[in-house]
Every structure is written in C-alpha cells, then in structure tokens.
Amino acid sequence: MQRNEMDDAGRCGMALTRRRTLGAAGATALATLAGCLTDDGSDTREYSLSIDRIERSPVEHALYEPDDSPLFGDPAETALSNVLPDGRHTTYGYKPVPNDGYVEYEGSYFQLIYVVTGRQQMERQLVRVETVPEEQVPEDAILVDSLERPSARIIKILHSDSQSGGGSSTAELLRDDGYVLRRPSERESRLARGELDGRVVTMTDSGAWAYRVDVTTETITETAHTVMATEVATSQSEFREVVFGSRIDAELTPAELPADAREILDEAIAGGTYTEEAPKTAAFETLLAALGLGAVDTAANGKLLWYDDELYRYGLYSNTTEDGS
C-alpha cells in the first residue's frame, strides 16, 4: 500500500516531492499522477533496499568449508591440514583459503590469517589468447565446454577479458594479459601439458568468439602468502559471539523499530526489494540508519542482518533516472 496517497489527480497543485514504487498498485498510482510531474528533464535519484533470507544460522554461515573440486577444494584441504591447529602453509601467487575465514577443528574455532613472507622468482606457465576471425576458424577447433574444468575456466577468463577490453572483473586474475598457471590442477591441465598450445578454441558451436591459444614458460616474481590459524573460541556459544561481533552488520528486533520503519523492512523482506525516490521518507531514513546505511550515497552490498531470529543479506543501491523517460 502507499501511505499519504493523494485522493485524486486534482490535488496536483500540491508539490509532489516523493513517490514510492511498490509493485503493480504503486505503478498504477504513479500512472494516474503522471500528469502532475513536471517534464523539465530533471533527474530523479532512486534508492533500492534489497534483502534476502539466508537459510542458515549465523554460525553455519560464517564457517568456511572447502568445496569438493580438485581445482579449489584440494588446495584448500591441503592448506587446512597443514595449518590446523598451529601450523603454517605457504603458497606463491595465490591464496588457497579465504583471508579471515573461520574454520572449526576438534570443537574449537579458528580464524585464518595471511601474512606476506617474501617473494620468490620461479618459472611459471602463462596462457594468452589471440582472437581468430570466424571465417578463419579451422574444422578441428575445440569447443571450450569440451575441455576439463581448469582449462575451460582459464579460456573463459581470457575471453571475458578480451571482450571487455581488460575491464572485466576477471582482469585482476591476469598478469600482462596472461593467466598464470599456479594451482595444482592448473599445472596438471591440458594447457600445462601443451596439448592446447597453438590450437583454436571456440566459445560456441557456431565458431563465434574463437581464440588461438599461446602457452609460454616465463620466470616471474611471485609473492609468498603464508596462512596461519588463530584460535578465537573453544565452544559454539563463544564462537557465536565472535560471529556477531565481526560479521553481523545490524542486529534488530521488531520492537526496536518504529512502526512505519518496521513496515518498510517487512515489506522488503516479503518482496526482496523496497524502492523510494528522493527525497527519502522519514521512515525509510530511520530504517537505513538502523541498518548502518544512513551515510551510503551510491551503493553498499553484502551486509548481514539478524532480525527477528532470522539471518538476512542486504544492500542499498541508488541510481539516477531522467524524469519523463
């Protein structure tokens, strides 16, 4: 429902300073009032609060567990077996487990902490690709999805970088436009064995987005990342307090919020998103302040909320739209 909804379009003489987008009912109301809005080409800032329920407890959500893949899981398992409870594990150029991650070991809880312990020159294989025009794709070109996971993942990363001109989120995984084979599965892949060197790999069956693969061996300087574990709790109840102190961004009960702010939060939980246009209502401002988002101007995401004995992930996003567009 819309609060403070105007009775009819005849009241457009009053300054209409805010609108709330609340599904179909809200859209209909906005359409009715559209004639009231000045078509001066001015921009309108829109704020969207997104929130999703996490179907795990805060303790379960905080604990890191390696997956079962050889590519990521095996190096992580090796690191944990060397680190827990009081060891060290060093890798060069990559981190096999998350920094600051929490793990459980024999009833106690530990936090993983990395330190840089030096650099070392070593020989590494680097994979680069060169675009091949579709009309020059050979009949024996290899479809990327037919490759084993380590090789396919690397080609897809290089494809993404090529298509974005180096502006994709995967660019940080590359070194001078090349992917360095570091993880054990990568160093045992078809790319590492030279089976794909000089071959053309396509991203689709039609031959679109084709690349010639180039694998070289170079001497590069790798950073030494050493991970250790620090015990933070000796029981689950103690660890829960650690999690709430370090991972939970907002802890609220329904009684702590004014009724109008609580209504907005419940609406966002039910629908996944709640949106307002600037200027924000007082109730929305109150809720954002309670969530620690009062000073956010553009975006904040990945936040965690404990509300009414449930765990949620939330974020705030804003964008500017042109009125009348």
Give, region by region, the residue ranges found by the protein language model.
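Terminal disorder- and signal-encoded targeting elements
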Residues: 1-325
